[in-house]
Each structure stands twice: as structure tokens, then as C-alpha cells.
Design a protein with these regions (language model features):
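PLP-dependent aspartate aminotransferase-fold enzymes
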Residues: 1-59, 184
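Active-site core of PLP-dependent enzymes with the aminotransferase class I/II
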Residues: 48-52, 65-91
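A short glycine-threonine-serine/GTX helix/turn-capping micro-motif
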Residues: 50, 146-156
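Helix C-cap/helix->beta junction micro-motif
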Residues: 87-89, 197, 236
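Active-site PLP attachment segment
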Residues: 112-144, 155-162
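Structural signature of PLP-dependent enzymes
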Residues: 166-188, 219
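PLP-dependent enzyme catalytic core of the Aspartate aminotransferase-like
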Residues: 171-173, 232-261
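Conserved PLP-binding catalytic core of the aspartate aminotransferase-like
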Residues: 183-187, 191-229
Length: 261
């Protein structure tokens, strides 16, 4: 489901700095004919996207992106992307593998109010069990009936059962409000600790996915600070990155343990 890992994406580089997103990765074994069939664009830079569409025109089959991560996009951005896509005869596809379900049953698109043609969901949808879903409008999905689609695990019902149970639980327990309240409490307590330290750091982002941001005039220091943070938190028994992913099984005690660490 995640759009960035098409085979052709192995040839992509960050359009802002020309670097591949993962150090040490090469497009080994990927046919050279696929190079250039996926084109990266800069998130929230609508001029950059429009320029690419003007250059490639009807060759653009779809615009695919994560609608958001830890921060909401600027107001109107996704509406503009959808308008550009449809004006060009292209599909709009959202990757909600990470941002879907925690924020809202229905995904970030429900919160933001922009419905794409196709969406990929996974992860929180099934509470960690292996499960993914590709959903969309009839017009977008109907061609699959004329395509070769196969699977080795058609009969696996565990992921389906886990997803059904998870979605029912989220709906019956007002998950949107729970994540809002829990995330804001977490951010408040972590901020108090940060404010009392000598480290230039802050916590920001939406309540369902707060993110710790280290600040330094030397950009090369930031990855080292992140690594040190993860290492020292692990020593205190808290296994995490610099992004929090609350679940409804977490308690106030878990926040206190994190803050003490």
C-alpha cells in the first residue's frame, strides 16, 4: 500500500537536496526502464507540483502522498492537490497507513475534509495484526475486476477479525476524544520536563502523534541528539523513537513513566 516503495521509487531522490531518503540504498536489481516513472514532489509546495504536472501532463496517472504526518497541512493545500489532479485527469491517492485510524475512524481525510479517489490503510486499523486495505470510489476501483490480482493468503481471517474488533472498539469508546485528551496530557507533562532542562528541544504535533524536535544551529548534530535520546530512553525502559504513537491501552501511568525517564 505505501506508495514510496514501488520498484521505480528506488531511483528517487529528495527533490530538495538531491539525496536518497535512506543512506546506503542503491537501485540494485531494479530495471533501468523503471527510472523516471515515479516523480517526487515537495510536500506543501503547490507550485512545485503544478510545474511537474505541466511538464508531464497526461503521463501523470496519479498523485500519491501522505495527507499528513504529525502536523496538519496548511489550510487548502490538499484541496489544491485534488483540483490539480482531477483537472489533469489524474487520480488522487492517499497513503493513510500511518496517519489513519488513530486520529479518526475514517482517517485524516475525514478530519481534513478532502476525499481522495483511492486510499491505503493499515497498521492501527487492525491494532498491530497484519492487515491492509485499499479502498476508493467505484470508478477508481472497478478496473481491478479486469486486472490480475492474486494472493497467497486469501483465506486468512485473523487480520479481518482484528480490524473489525478494533474499529468497533474505537467507535464505541469515542476514540477521537480519547486521543485528543491523552495526547494533550502527554504533551503538557513532557513540555514541563523540557522547559526545566538545558536542552533546546520542544514537543509539537497533533495529540494522536506528538513529535519531539531537537533544535540546533548545527544541523548535523540533530540526528546525533535523536540517537542519544532513543538510546537513553531505552536504558530507562521506554522503547520509543522521537515520535509518540499512543494507543488506547496506554494509561496515565505510562505518561508518568515516560516523563520520569
Amino acid at each position: 500500500g505505501w506508495h514510496d516503495w514501488y520498484q521505480s521509487a528506488n531511483y528517487l531522490v529528495n527533490p530538495e537536496d538531491g539525496e536518497f531518503p535512506f543512506a546506503g540504498i542503491e537501485p540494485i536489481g531494479v530495471p533501468k526502464a523503471l527510472a523516471g516513472t515515479a516523480i517526487p514532489f515537495i510536500y506543501e509546495d503547490i507550485k512545485n507540483l503544478k510545474k511537474l504536472i505541466d511538464e508531464h501532463g497526461e503521463d501523470v496517472a496519479a498523485i500519491m502522498l501522505e495527507p499528513m504526518r504529525s502536523e496538519f497541512p496548511r489550510q487548502g493545500y490538499l484541496e489544491e492537490v485534488k483540483e490539480l489532479a482531477h483537472k489533469n485527469g489524474s487520480l488522487l491517492i492517499f497513503d493513510e497507513v500511518s496517519c489513519g485510524w488513530r486520529m479518526s475512524v475514517g482517517g485524516a481525510q475525514k478530519k481534513i475534509g478532502v476525499t481522495p479517489d483511492i486510499t491505503a490503510f493499515a497498521k492501527a486499523m487492525s491494532n498491530g495484526y497484519p492487515m491492509g486495505a485499499v479502498v476508493g470510489s467505484y470508478e477508481s476501483m472497478e478496473p481491478a475486476d479486469r486486472m490480475f490480482v492474486s494472493s497467497s493468503y486469501w483465506s486468512d481471517n485473523i487480520g479481518l477479525s482484528a480490524s473489525k474488533a478494533t474499529i468497533e472498539y474505537l467507535l464505541s469508546n469515542n476514540s477521537e476524544k480519547w486521543f485528543e485528551d491523552y495526547g494533550n496530557t502527554l504533551k503538557k507533562k513532557v513540555t514541563e520536563v523540557m522547559d526545566s532542562s538545558s536542552v533546546n528541544v520542544k514537543i509539537s504535533g497533533i495529540p494522536s502523534g506528538p513529535i519531539i524536535q531537537f533544535i540546533s544551529e548545527e544541523s548535523s548534530e540533530i540526528p546525533l541528539m535523536k540517537t542519544l535520546f532513543v538510546q537513553e530512553m531505552a536504558k530507562q525502559g521506554v522503547h520509543m523513537s522521537t515520535v509518540f504513537h499512543p494507543t488506547m491501552s496506554h494509561t496515565e501511568e505510562d505518561i508518568d513513566i515516560t516523563v520520569r525517564a
